[in-house]
């Protein structure tokens, strides 16, 4: 496959996201995670229900209020809510009749074998810490060196435990 640049960046005004859905696949050249933003005008919502073959989705509500229809259940949404939806569940979003609703949708496909370690706090526990090369804002800070020693020991204990 194609070699991607080592990072991609785009900027959207979080306080005034573009209306409806903004897909970030192309601007960010995504290959392993789906992400989009939504800004539904008051009283408006998806025009159809949808589900997925494999993709798990997380809806993150940044502002406003509304509902998400999950199967036959209406779930109220407000700023600060995070909702995970299993792939086969039919879903659709709608903003409140008086207030718009904006947020972020993140999607991913389960990969067999993750989390690899029972004690992991992250799902995709494939991080490779470089304990020797600190970011410039931490250089020379002995407290950070001590914190990192503890973190390294915790990570090694989790890996050893399986």
Predicted regions mapped to residue ranges:
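Conserved short histidine dyad/triad with adjacent acidic residue
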Residues: 19-23, 36-52
